[in-house]
């Protein structure tokens, strides 16, 4: 019951309104129901999911942006799965790394590799310039590879 109420209040913090009578989640009660039920739900309704998705796209699209390496304030640590300043790549500890483009012990690219990951990286090589790496939404144009990086830049 406590977890259900916490999920409900978190929903409000994320900008989700209480469900209307027409909302459905495939259960007797949904997380964002305006009334408390004896049978707490673990599901958000179609209305809640639509509202959250719409708000995320229309108002909080920046949350979908990948952080820059320079945004991280802790010292770089090779083996944490996140490429930080000074690392070319980071595929985790050597025992777990499954990326042939990345040397897990050094967090540097393997010999002959141009990239280790990203929408513009294919088999350790940069995808040629002008290839679409992310379709545009709304008025935003398609994002295209530069041919100089494995990352897909935002062409907004």
From Swiss-Prot:
One of its GO terms (molecular function) is metal ion binding. It is found in: Secreted. Residues 146-156 have a biased composition (Polar residues). Keywords: Cell adhesion impairing toxin, Disulfide bond, Hemostasis impairing toxin, Hydrolase, Metal-binding, Metalloprotease, Platelet aggregation inhibiting toxin, Protease, Secreted, Toxin, Zinc, Zymogen. It comes from the Eukaryota. Expressed by the venom gland. The keyword Zinc applies. A motif (Cell attachment site) lies at residues 137-139. Its main location: secreted. Its cofactor is Zn(2+). Disulfide bonds join 23-47, 25-30, 78-97, 89-107, 91-102, 101-124, 115-121, 120-145, 133-152. One of its GO terms (biological process) is proteolysis. GO terms for cellular component: extracellular region; plasma membrane. Residues 136-156 are annotated as: Disordered. PROSITE patterns: ADAM_MEPRO, DISINTEGRIN_1, DISINTEGRIN_2. Binds 1 zinc ion per subunit. Its EC number is 3.4.24.-. It holds the Pfam family Disintegrin. InterPro entries: Disintegrin_CS (IPR018358), Disintegrin_dom (IPR001762), Disintegrin_dom_sf (IPR036436), MetalloPept_cat_dom_sf (IPR024079), Peptidase_M12B (IPR001590). Residues 136-145 have a biased composition (Basic and acidic residues). Residues 75-156 form the Disintegrin domain. The active site is at residue 9. Zn(2+) binds at residues 8, 12. Belongs to the venom metalloproteinase (M12B) family. P-II subfamily. P-IIb sub-subfamily. Monomer. This is Zinc metalloproteinase-disintegrin jararin. It comes from Bothrops jararaca. The lineage of its organism: Eukaryota, Metazoa, Chordata, Craniata, Vertebrata.
């Amino acid at each position: 019951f406590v977890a259900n109420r916490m999920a409900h209040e978190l929903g409000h913090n994320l900008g989700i309104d209480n469900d209307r009578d027409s909302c459905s989640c495939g259960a007797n009660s949904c997380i964002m129901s305006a009334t408390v039920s004896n049978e707490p739900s673990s599901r958000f309704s179609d209305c809640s999911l639509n509202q959250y998705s719409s708000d995320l796209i229309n108002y909080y699209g920046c949350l979908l942006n990948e952080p820059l390496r320079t945004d991280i304030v802790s010292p770089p640590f090779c083996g944490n799965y996140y490429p930080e300043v000074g690392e070319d790549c980071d595929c985790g500890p050597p025992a777990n790394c499954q990326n042939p483009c990345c040397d897990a012990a050094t967090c540097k690219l393997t010999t002959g590799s141009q990239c280790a990951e990203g929408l513009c990286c294919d088999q350790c090589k940069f995808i040629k310039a002008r290839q679409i790496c992310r379709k545009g939404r709304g008025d935003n144009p398609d994002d295209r590879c530069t041919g100089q990086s494995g990352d897909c830049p935002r062409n907004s």
